[in-house]
Each structure stands twice: as structure tokens, then as C-alpha cells.
Amino acid sequence: MALNDFHVSEPYTLGIELEMQVINPPGYDLSQDSSTLIDAVKPQLTAGEIKHDITESMLEMATGVCRDIDQAAAQLSAMQHVILQAASEHHLGICGGGTHPFQKWQRQEVCDNERYQRTLENFGYLIQQATVFGQHVHVGCANGDDAIYLLHGLSHFVPHFIALSAASPYMQGADTRFACARLNIFSAFPDNGPMPWVSNWQEFTGLFRRLSYTTMIDSIKDLHWDIRPSPAFGTVEVRVMDTPLTLDHAINMAGLIQATAHWLLTERPFKPQEQDYLLYKFNRFQACRYGLEGVLTDAYTGDRRRLADDTLRLLDNVTPSARKLGADSAIDALRLQVKKGGNEAQYMREFIADGGSLIGLVQKHCEIWAGQ
């Protein structure tokens, strides 16, 4: 299939997608009733979109094109209200978190959707195992070459985005010892991790053409890279974050990515090179395993530094851009989070260490999302 031309969009505009867990109280396992919930809420939407994801226990909230994080927050808040009301009427719960802590993948029903059924045929049980929940952030770009530069620039900070959003320490009833176990689910996919190296949009179109020869790639949506260009939207999409437990944290992560994109495209602090990716997966692993306590290694010098320290440096670098975009509140909140030394994965472990159960943890997550 031919690749769409890169749609020109207003630089730094935002789109946010949140994959939510649909929960079945009182056992607090995943429900298989997302279709019922989606049908109930669609007629009530005034902005944004609520739609299926891979399995019937997943529900995706997606904003429209937003100028800033305030507009995105307003759209997501309105959708959140409608979904919670419908969920209550259907005796269901909704929550964030990158994984459900004790669901069994064998029980997950793939949505009755042509694309997902085709994906099930291609990937088998891997698709059921991919019942995990992430936040994706789109940032607008003026042209395809800017999109490729931005993708390479943002790739420097994939560990930072993972560590700040990590919220998936439990899986299949066990503590994985990872801060973010969600991304491990995709390790068996042939397109896992970073996009293969290209230096401009023309090279990317050639890459996509060759990938389509495999017969497994019909559109850009079939590529599961950590960051990918989305030519139909005119955006670059960052896909490595766990779905947060609160809407506020989701907005803060989007604000960071928007501000980082502005800094990268206006300052051009990097000259992208293929060697930039030499230690990409090692640094990504550190963030998934240890969160903000992970250690980054420089591919050129071999220097090592704590991820928390480097995240503070990133926040300082993007602060002027955040002010211009109206995202400085997000940077301030994330800076405070890093200085306190925590993420949501640590909160979850503390809940269990204090005597809580995994069932109680999911119940608490539903209460948090509902603002209780």
C-alpha cells in the first residue's frame, strides 16, 4: 500500500490518546464489555473520540487537534465525565495503569474489527497478550523532513518519557520487578523498538515501501515503533508511555512532549546520526526496569548518568519552550515528581507493601480515575 503524503499541520499542535482499562467489579478483573460502553457514550460526545482498541477490555479516548494542553485537558475531562457516568450505569469501572495486575491474556477477546482480526491472524496470541494500556501523544509538524528530525530528536528522551510515566509493575498476578513491564509485551513483534534509520522523508517513503513487501504492513498503524510519523495527521506520535492513573499526569506528559518538540525544532540541538541508536535499547531497558533510578550510557563517550538527573536537565532545557506554549505548569509538576523521586509504579508497590491486595489496587485505581 502506498504511503500517504505528509499532511501539513500547524507545528506543535497536540493530540492525545489514552488506552483505558474497562473493569468488572466486584472482582476487579478486566471486563469484556467495552463495546457496550462505547455504544452508550458515542452519541454524547461533543469533541474528541471514544473507540475500540485491540480487545474488548480496552477503551481509547482520543482528543481532536488541540492548540495547547488546556484545550486537550478540557476535551479529555469532558470524555472522562461521560465515560464514568455510562460505566456507573453499566456497573463497570474505568482506570489507568499500563497493565492490569492479574488479568489472564487467554481470556481476552479481540474486537470484532477487520483490522484487529487481521492482526490476530498475523500475530496470534501476541495480540491477546497486548492487552496493555498506553498513552500516545501526537505533535504537529510542518513537513515530512521536520517530522523525521523530530522523531530522531525525541528518541534521545524515550528513557525519560518511560521513567516518568512508568505504571506497570504487576502482570499476570506477579511483581515483574520492572517499573514499566508493559513495553516488554511488544518485544516479540518484528517492529518493536526504534524505527529503522532514515535521514529524511524521501528515505522514509522508501523504507515504508520495502516494509509493505512483507504483506504484514497495510498502513502506518501496523507499525509498532516507539515513535512513528503519522503522515495522514501531519504528526509525530510518541508511544512509549504507560497510561497514567490520573488525567493530570497524562496532561503533564503531553505538555513535556510538546515542549520538547518545540525546543528540538527551534534550537536543533542535535545532528541526527545512526550511531545515536547504538545503545538505544540498553538505555530503554534501564528506564523500563528501574524507572528514574536507571542509568543512561552515552553512545559516544561512555559517560554514565542517573536518569533522574538527566530528566531534570531535560526539564530545564525545555522550560522556555513550555512557557511559550502554555505548558509550564506541566514542567513544574514533573520537576517536582523527579525531585520527590517517584512514579506511579512505586506508589503501586507501596500500596501492596502496606498490606493491600492486587484486587484492592485495581479498586483504588478506579477510585483515583473517578476523582474519589
Curated annotation (Swiss-Prot):
Sorted keywords for this record are:
ATP-binding, Ligase, Nucleotide-binding
Reply yes or no: does the keyword Ligase apply. yes
Group of enzyme by EC: ligase
Q: What is its EC number?
A: 6.3.2.2
GO molecular function ontology, one term from the record: glutamate-cysteine ligase activity
Reaction(s) catalysed by this chain, per the record, are: L-cysteine + L-glutamate + ATP = gamma-L-glutamyl-L-cysteine + ADP + phosphate + H(+)
Q: Does the keyword Ligase apply?
A: yes
Database matches in Gene3D superfamilies:
3.30.590.20
Q: How does it assemble?
A: Homodimer.
Q: What is the annotated role of this protein in its UniProt record?
A: ATP-dependent carboxylate-amine ligase which exhibits weak glutamate--cysteine ligase activity.
Q: What is this protein called?
A: Putative glutamate--cysteine ligase 2
The source organism is: Salmonella paratyphi B (strain ATCC BAA-1250 / SPB7)
Q: Which gene encodes it?
A: ybdK
